[in-house]
Amino acid sequence: MSKLKELIEKFCPNGVEYQKLDDILDYEQPTQYIVKSTEYDDSYNTPVLTAGQTFILGYTNEEDGIYKADKDSPTIIFDDFTTSFHWVDFDFKVKSSAMKMLRPKSTFEGSFKYVFYAMECIHFEAVNHTRHWISKYSQFEIPLPHPEVQEEIVKILDRFAEYAAELQAELQARQEQYEYYRDKLLTFNEIGGGYSRCNMDENE
């Protein structure tokens, strides 16, 4: 944090400017990337994504119309109706046209990942069932400090995101361990070579 403070004092002595997302990001419609068949199988290679909570709906073996993304050229998938979004750095197809793929404009000189994190700070509740990116969401402004400040913020937040993912994985593993032993301990016919059921007589 001390390095971040130094960078802010160096590059942002008078505060930071704000820019609209519309001035930072371009969007692409998903039409050509929509999956044709919903017969998914985990043995297939290409994930089918939704920008909602489920994220990965399944995997397809379709080879055409795959959206190309990787670590060096990621994208943000944005649900045009709910305004939920995800960071994606792998190839994929999509389930429906209810999303947009966002990438930085060629003129943007900052950190795309910083923009993603800044978007997570936008508090907007989608009430009406209508598309929101063009009419509303893209008009929100985010702070844009010097690129070096952006990069340092991303490093810090990436580190915390990694910690959170590790904790979540640990919690999931502990939950599965708990359920295993709970079921094992409460299945008495598997303990001590079996058991006999006893009927209780209230008069005894």
Sequence positions of predicted segments:
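Charged, alpha-helix-forming regions
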Residues: 1-204
